């Protein structure tokens, strides 16, 4: 099995048509006027939409290969930096910070999540906006009674 998190070109190919979060993120970015910070920016899937608004964009990620791909795609139009979303220290604050595509769930412990949120707090302007995009499933879909068969549906 191929790990798409080690192959940024493959990751981009698989996710090229994902845009379910674009409208909300661009609306909030435009409303705040930037600058914009994306955590777990990966290859910069959403950077294009922010840049198209004429806003300053910074993306952080912990993957060197994904950051290299993002820098190759956007050159000096955007800033991409190697940082862990749990503990990052940048020289500026942002009017809009977001973490999309369920990436907040890479914070595997409460401590990880708390550190991430503290780092966001440290970099968000006083009237800034922070968005976390997470899929929250219906609990009834996750719970299955033991020793009970469930019909298959298509």
Identify the function of each model-found stretch:
Residues 1-34, 131-154:
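Conserved class I S-adenosyl-L-methionine
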Residues 98-100:
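A conserved beta-strand element that flanks and buttresses the S-adenosyl-L-methionine
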Residues 40-42:
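Class I SAM-dependent methyltransferase "Motif I" SAM/SAH-binding loop
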Residues 114-126:
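A short glycine-rich, Lys/Arg-flanked "PGG" loop and its adjoining helix->strand segment in the class I
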Residues 48-87:
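Class I SAM-dependent methyltransferase SAM/SAH-binding core
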Residues 89-96:
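A short acidic, Gly/Pro-enriched loop at the edge of an enzyme's catalytic core
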């Amino acid at each position: 099995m191929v790990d798409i998190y080690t192959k940024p070109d493959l990751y981009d190919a698989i996710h090229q048509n994902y845009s379910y979060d674009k409208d909300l993120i661009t609306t909030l970015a435009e409303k705040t006027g930037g600058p914009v910070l994306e955590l777990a920016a990966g290859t910069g899937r959403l950077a294009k939409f922010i840049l198209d608004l004429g806003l300053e964009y910074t993306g952080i990620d912990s993957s060197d290969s994904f950051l290299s791909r993002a820098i190759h795609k956007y050159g000096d139009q955007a800033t991409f930096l190697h940082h862990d979303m749990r503990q990052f220290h940048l020289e500026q604050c942002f009017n809009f910070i977001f973490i999309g595509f369920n990436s907040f769930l890479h914070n595997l412990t409460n401590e990880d999540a708390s550190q991430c949120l503290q780092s966001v707090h440290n970099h968000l302007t006083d009237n800034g906006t922070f968005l976390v995009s997470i899929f929250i499933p219906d609990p009834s879909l996750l719970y299955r009674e033991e020793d009970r068969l469930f019909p298959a549906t298509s």
